[in-house]
């Protein structure tokens, strides 16, 4: 259910600045193919890993591959800080820009403050207050330590679902690519509607009625 790299090529225009690829349900996108498209067209690759904290692509954790990777810390995700999210990058220039962007566009350059005084700062561009509080951070860090166990539990549940659904021809369970490990934020089944007498909404309501 992730984006097709070939479809990305069809959408590129001279105005394109970046590619934002979503790791839907926790399954990493094809980072090799999409990364090559970004590199060939001088574009920034932003990986939306809101669903994919802890997922891996070719034995590398998501967050260590794209130019920037975003994660959600909403209460329904793998770990939470109450609300909000975070962005990671290995690019020092992007990191500097992100720090300004989260703090009202303010630059607190260390060397400049040494020369002109600790009160010195410049508001260099439009920015916002996206700073995570220490209380929120502590909550997230404490849960981050539990992430491996949380991921393992999700994978055990996926195995049970796959076994339970294996002989039901009316649906197709989600697949995991051979070179990736999904974080299984969601377990999305595909209904084979041609073999069913009910549509998706009716099945959804019936499942909800059974809790």
Residue map of PLM features:
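Hydrophobic residues in beta-strands of the RecA-like P-loop NTPase core, especially within AAA+ ATPase
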Residues: 22, 46-47
């Amino acid at each position: 259910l992730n984006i097709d790299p070939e479809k990305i090529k069809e959408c590129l225009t001279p105005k394109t600045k970046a590619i934002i690829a979503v790791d839907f349900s926790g399954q990493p996108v094809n980072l090799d193919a999409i990364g090559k498209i970004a590199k060939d067209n001088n574009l920034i690759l932003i990986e939306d890993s809101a669903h994919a904290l802890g997922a891996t692509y070719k034995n590398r954790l998501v967050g260590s591959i794209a130019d920037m990777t975003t994660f959600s810390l909403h209460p329904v995700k793998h770990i939470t800080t109450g609300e909000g999210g975070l962005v990671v990058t290995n690019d020092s220039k992007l990191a500097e820009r992100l720090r300004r962007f989260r703090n009202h566009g303010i630059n607190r350059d260390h060397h400049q403050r040494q020369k002109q005084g600790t009160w010195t700062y410049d508001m260099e561009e439009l920015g916002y207050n996206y700073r995570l509080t220490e209380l929120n951070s502590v909550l997230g860090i404490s849960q981050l330590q539990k992430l491996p166990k949380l991921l393992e539990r999700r994978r055990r549940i996926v195995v049970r679902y796959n076994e339970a659904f294996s002989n039901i021809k009316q649906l197709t369970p989600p697949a995991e690519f051979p070179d990736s490990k999904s974080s299984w934020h969601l377990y999305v089944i595909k209904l084979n509607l041609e073999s069913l007498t009910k549509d998706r909404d009716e099945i959804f309501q019936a499942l909800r009625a059974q809790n």
